[in-house]
From Swiss-Prot:
The lineage of its organism: Eukaryota, Metazoa, Chordata, Craniata, Vertebrata. Pfam families: Ribosomal_60s, Ribosomal_L10, RL10P_insert. Residues 289-319 are annotated as: Disordered. This is Large ribosomal subunit protein uL10. GO terms for biological process: chordate embryonic development; cytoplasmic translation; ribosome biogenesis. GO terms for molecular function: large ribosomal subunit rRNA binding; structural constituent of ribosome. It comes from Danio rerio (Zebrafish). P0 forms a pentameric complex by interaction with dimers of P1 and P2.
Amino acid sequence: MPREDRATWKSNYFLKIIQLLDDFPKCFIVGADNVGSKQMQTIRLSLRGKAVVLMGKNTMMRKAIRGHLENNPALERLLPHIRGNVGFVFTKEDLTEVRDLLLANKVPAAARAGAIAPCEVTVPAQNTGLGPEKTSFFQALGITTKISRGTIEILSDVQLIKPGDKVGASEATLLNMLNMLNISPFSYGLIIQQVYDNGSVYSPEVLDITEDALHKRFLKGVRNIASVCLQIGYPTLASIPHTIINGYKRVLAVTVETDYTFPLAEKVKAYLADPTAFAVAAPVAAATEQKSAAPAAKEEAPKEDSEESDEDMGFGLFD
């Protein structure tokens, strides 16, 4: 009987993961190290209506995906990433929005000896409030301290742990003592390892790329292409406008140095022959605009006078 129950559970699990893979075009492969059942329940509640979390044994997930490759060959790209303590977060919503919800559900945690540090830990310079008997912990970690008013004071900021480092016993003990100072260096939650989007698998860092960043990179690429094409004389859509402008400038330069001319070059020649004429023409044009604006102002002034005369027809406030 237990075997039948286990077999039924496996069968239902296979059907569930296949159904989710068919229904949801996008999903995250997430790491679940140090995530407890209570925190997982909180994450599921926060994602309700937007995403579905599915955990399970790696062998079962791989077997279910391999059995479904005939219907969706693109799922094979997921197989190399199913290793370690991982699960799936399926969604139809915006991936960035779901990612932000997962990040919001991280919880601070104390350091444990033997754990892998998920982030850098720096102990700031401060008075720890700890008694002199705890000095040995700081000495073992190479942290410079002094005794100030009967308590240990850290003299300078110290980088205690780097990302990926294994937390030692001394580091864990010190950090747990510093928890009394509201220093909770680690936070745990579902960590996005890979993103699956309609058959494509990519790193979660891609989600940080905004439209503005893409636009800037595109423009930079266009400028680089135009520059290279101009240098080698190869015409492209990016370089042709610059080629035409540069050619026009060269033609103008030739007309200036020779007797050859054309209508568009006449103005350039006139400017070079007498630059002061153009300097005088600009103030004259500005003065003409001011004169044309003055009559309009004069026409508005009599209207205001007539309105004032109408108001003063002879009746006082108390007549």
